[in-house]
Every structure is written in structure tokens, then in C-alpha cells.
Amino acid sequence: GMDPIAVTAQEGPKTDKEKFKEVEQSLTWQLEMPNGLICEGKASYFEGMNYLKAEAEKGIFELTSAFNYSGQRGNTPEGAMDFKKVNQQAKQMDDFASAIKDNRPTPVPGEMGRRDVRIIQAIYKAMETGKRVLIEK
């Protein structure tokens, strides 16, 4: 996959200025990819957003209940997706333990988390400055 190279971001309006005086109520951002694609995202402490949607040449791909522990539903241009019920955290912890025991890399290394933190920091910097921010490698 590709990592984003730059981001712009905007803080949404605050409908409860007391509750959200020290934190954003909502935030939208646009990640620029090296090939020119733009990824638009939104997060909110107020709105109930629990879905993921991607628009591509061959149609729309989406997940509902995307961030729950179970109950995800997905649709593609070819029909519904079928998800087995799994405990994601248990599978990841078991894989970490096996990777250490078997002296092999894990598919989700710490570098991915560090990359994600850099992207999140760039999103907040873009929101605070109102400017396009390059994402450090």
C-alpha cells in the first residue's frame, strides 16, 4: 500500500462549546497519496459514525458497524461480504506471542503504529494551522 505524503484538515463546528472547549467536536481531513489519490476522513466525539466507505473505478465498497467488536457488514459491487466472528485483540496478541516464540516478524509491527501517530500528528497540525502539512517519513 501507499503512505500519505501530505494532509489538510478542518475542525468542525462546536454545538456544545462547554463540553468541547478543550477538544474538537469533530474533525475532517484529506490525505494526499503519492499517486494523486485523495482519502477523505472524518472523526467525531459527538456524531455516531461507525462506517467505512471507499469509492473506486468498479464501484463502492463499504462496511457498517465497521469499528465494533462484532457485527460488521460489508458490501461490494459483487455483493455482500461475509465475516466470521473473531476476537481481533486475542488473535493479535496470540500472533505477537507466536512471533516472539518463533523468531519471526509480525504482520502488524510497531513501525505501523509509529507511522499512524505521525499521520495523526500531521492531521492535528493541519487543523490547528489551516495549512497543508507534509507528513514526515
Residue ranges and their predicted role:
Residues 1-38, 43-49, 111:
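Rossmann-like dinucleotide-binding domain that binds NAD(P)(H)
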Residues 52, 67-77:
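Short polybasic amphipathic segments
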Residues 46-48, 60-61, 69-70:
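Short, surface-exposed beta-strand-loop junctions and turns on beta-sheet-rich folds
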Residues 82-94:
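Active-site loop of classical SDR/Rossmann-like NAD(P)-dependent oxidoreductases
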Residues 32-34, 55, 72:
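A generic structural motif
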